[in-house]
């Protein structure tokens, strides 16, 4: 729906002044693309998996939206929903970690920064973990690590292919060494999954950085990424200051990493489900309907 059509529907029979004026995004009906500046009717944007129809920019989406885009309707069965983070170090910077947790849980409706569960993609059973950047920047703490590890172990036991959707700033500093240990714990579980001969694919979305990049995000049999996703370990400014040289403009993008062999395929969000299904079938995974 175009801006003109929307005004026509809303104000039939009324004089409309300043028709070309951009609508207020604050009303929740419109979204402005940060890439091309196009103002899009929000319902149209959501119906296109939050991808700009004008320039292809991938807007950030939360874990619930991500699951809806990826899996068959009503097929997702969540796991370990009761797990909740604590504050073992009594950490406090400008604010107490416990207060940050409570506020973030209230604003997002999540207990921590990842949702895990079993699902189907075009009828093919799969294990799925989806990180949510809204929860403290998608940072990886003890609960995130535990939930992903448990999911990997279930996938290994049931011989299920596994997809982890990465969206994270890295390890959660408020949990110190406990958060860093999740890198090794998840990596160990993934190695056992690999030894069992089962497919694992990480999907790198914007942004995937820090300890997540340094562990399970780069351990896949096939590494997928969304277009123009920021992927890296340290930040661009830190690297430039360390090397004392200017980095390429597209440095740490999905396209740059694919060009240099770190990413196998860049898949537009609107094609993800069909692409996943094709890859799963290519690796011998069958749908429940076909197998029955």
Swiss-Prot record:
Residue ranges of every copy of the CoA carboxyltransferase N-terminal domain listed in the record: 29-292
Keyword Zinc: yes
Cofactor names: Zn(2+)
Chief place where the protein resides: cytoplasm
Entry's cofactor comment: Binds 1 zinc ion per subunit.
SUPFAM superfamilies: ClpP/crotonase
EC number: 2.1.3.15
Cellular compartment(s): Cytoplasm
Keywords: ATP-binding, Cytoplasm, Fatty acid biosynthesis, Fatty acid metabolism, Lipid biosynthesis, Lipid metabolism, Metal-binding, Nucleotide-binding, Transferase, Zinc, Zinc-finger
Listed pathway(s): Lipid metabolism; malonyl-CoA biosynthesis; malonyl-CoA from acetyl-CoA: step 1/1
Zinc fingers classed as C4-type: ranges: 33-55
PROSITE patterns: COA_CT_NTER
Catalysed reaction equations from the record: N(6)-carboxybiotinyl-L-lysyl-[protein] + acetyl-CoA = N(6)-biotinyl-L-lysyl-[protein] + malonyl-CoA
One of the protein's GO biological processes: malonyl-CoA biosynthetic process
Positions that bind Zn(2+): 33, 36, 52, 55
GO CC terms: acetyl-CoA carboxylase complex
Gene3D superfamilies given in the database record: 2-enoyl-CoA Hydratase, Chain A, domain 1
Pfam families according to UniProt: Carboxyl_trans (PF01039), Zn_ribbon_ACC (PF17848)
GO molecular function ontology, one term from the record: acetyl-CoA carboxylase activity
Its job: Component of the acetyl coenzyme A carboxylase (ACC) complex. Biotin carboxylase (BC) catalyzes the carboxylation of biotin on its carrier protein (BCCP) and then the CO(2) group is transferred by the transcarboxylase to acetyl-CoA to form malonyl-CoA.
Homology family: Belongs to the AccD/PCCB family.
Oligomeric and partner information: Acetyl-CoA carboxylase is a heterohexamer composed of biotin carboxyl carrier protein (AccB), biotin carboxylase (AccC) and two subunits each of ACCase subunit alpha (AccA) and ACCase subunit beta (AccD).
Protein name stated in the entry: Acetyl-coenzyme A carboxylase carboxyl transferase subunit beta
Lineage: Bacteria, Bacillati, Cyanobacteriota, Cyanophyceae, Synechococcales
Gene behind this protein: accD
């Amino acid at each position: 729906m175009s801006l003109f059509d929307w005004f026509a529907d809303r104000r039939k029979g009324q004089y409309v002044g300043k028709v070309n004026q951009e609508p207020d995004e604050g009303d929740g009906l419109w979204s402005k693309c940060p890439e091309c500046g196009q103002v899009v009717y929000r319902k149209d944007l959501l119906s296109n998996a939050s991808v700009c129809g004008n320039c292809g920019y991938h807007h950030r989406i939360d874990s619930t939206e991500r699951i809806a885009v990826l899996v068959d309707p009503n097929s997702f069965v969540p796991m370990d929903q009761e797990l909740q983070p604590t504050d073992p170090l009594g950490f406090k910077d400008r604010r107490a970690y416990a207060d940050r947790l409570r506020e973030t849980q209230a604003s997002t409706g999540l207990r921590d920064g990842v949702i895990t569960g079993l699902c189907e993609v075009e009828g093919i059973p799969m294990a799925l973990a989806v990180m949510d950047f809204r929860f403290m920047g998608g940072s990886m703490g003890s609960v995130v690590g535990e939930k992903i590890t448990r999911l990997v172990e279930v996938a290994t036991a049931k011989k299920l292919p596994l997809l982890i959707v990465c969206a994270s700033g890295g390890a959660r500093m408020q949990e110190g060494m406990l958060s860093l240990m999740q890198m090794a714990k998840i990596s160990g579980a993934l190695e056992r999954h690999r030894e069992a001969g089962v497919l694992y694919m990480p999907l790198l979305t914007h942004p995937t950085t820090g300890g997540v990049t340094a562990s399970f995000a780069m351990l896949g049999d096939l590494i997928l990424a969304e277009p123009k996703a920021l992927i890296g370990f340290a930040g661009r400014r830190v690297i430039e200051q360390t090397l004392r040289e200017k980095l390429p403009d597209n440095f740490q993008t999905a396209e740059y990493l694919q060009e240099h062999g770190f990413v196998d395929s860049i898949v537009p969000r609107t094609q993800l489900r069909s692409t996943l299904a094709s890859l799963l079938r290519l690796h011998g995974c069958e749908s429940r309907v076909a197998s029955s």
